[in-house]
Amino acid sequence: METRNSSGLDQFCSLLVERPGLTLLDLAGANQSTMAFLTNLGHRVYSDDFLLQMDRCFGDGDFYENQADPEKVAQFLDAALDYPAQHFDGALVWDTLEFLSGPLLETVVQRLGNMLRPGSYMLALFHAEERAATIPTYSYRIQDRKTITLAPRGRRHPAQFFNNRSLEKLFQDFQSVKFFLTRDHLREVIVRR
């Protein structure tokens, strides 16, 4: 496991401290350190392993081809993102969006936007290595408000790579997109609904 400083997480957490009692979504799967950190701030946390849900729904055969199958997409959305509108005050999306192909990616971003209350924030990470055939995947764990622990989960082929312009387009229906410069292979983004 490795740790990294995260300016994006620090900004996300500064928004949480201002308003206790929020309802948050964590797509990295349940882990003790993140749960303890967020609940100690007085928040409720819903957790789901988004990558595991993707593997269950699309992993039999060609992972990205299966994301175009309407039945599998419906099964995935019901399993991973079946929450009411405006249910969450924030979401930790991590790097999960990189593994969704075009139409499904747009559907998931719309669904996330619908699940978030107006004015809420979402933290997402994107790999900056545009020429890499595979990228490392991690289970992200919050150690403190400025530090993330990355537990390796192997490597995957991303559906696509994102530069700042493509991220602005992806989140065009949101109020704002803020980018954080990092010294490693991850681009941090905070999106405001």
Please report, for each region that a protein language model flagged, where it lies by residue.
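Short, glycine/acidic-rich beta->alpha junctions
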Residues: 27-30, 104
